[in-house]
Amino acid sequence: MKNITDMEKDRQYMKMALELAQKGMGFTAPNPMVGAVIVKNEKIIGQGYHRKYGELHAEREALAACTEQPEGASMYVTLEPCCHYGKQPPCVNAILESGIRRVIVGSSDPNPLVAGKGIRILKDHGIEVTENF
């Protein structure tokens, strides 16, 4: 079980991801606004948000912005990572390839193409997932 200090850190990083997501307001429709923060050894090594419809999703932008290898890191993302091909490839694939060990998800994705499948794929590959944070 996590201690209060760890939970507070998780809340702070998720708050940062939510603030990043808001930067996409007015540009992402019909997609949702999403933010992501990657933390390794209590240091932010990458962050991103979905800037515009058709462009990189928040998870891929955060991974591209990493200042060091994300292997073993935690990702805080406001919405469940996608697991289907659309304008962008599945974000779950990028997360799996990156070596991230833990994903904290703010909300599950109600889109029927995702709807829990992204979380299930991550868990099936041994990634620790905290849902609906």
Please tell me what each predicted stretch does.
Residues 1, 18, 29-30, 39-40:
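Non-catalytic interface/targeting segments
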Residues 1-16, 126-129:
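Short, compositionally biased leader-like segments
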Residues 6-7, 23-27, 48-52, 56:
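Short, N-terminal intrinsically disordered low-complexity segments that are rich in Pro/Gly
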Residues 9-29:
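Short, basic/aromatic recognition patches
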Residues 30-32, 58-59:
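Short N-terminal amphipathic alpha-helix/helix-capping patch enriched in small hydrophobics
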Residues 31-34, 71:
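Acidic, glycine-enriched active-site microenvironments
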Residues 38-133:
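Zn2+-dependent cytidine deaminase-like catalytic core
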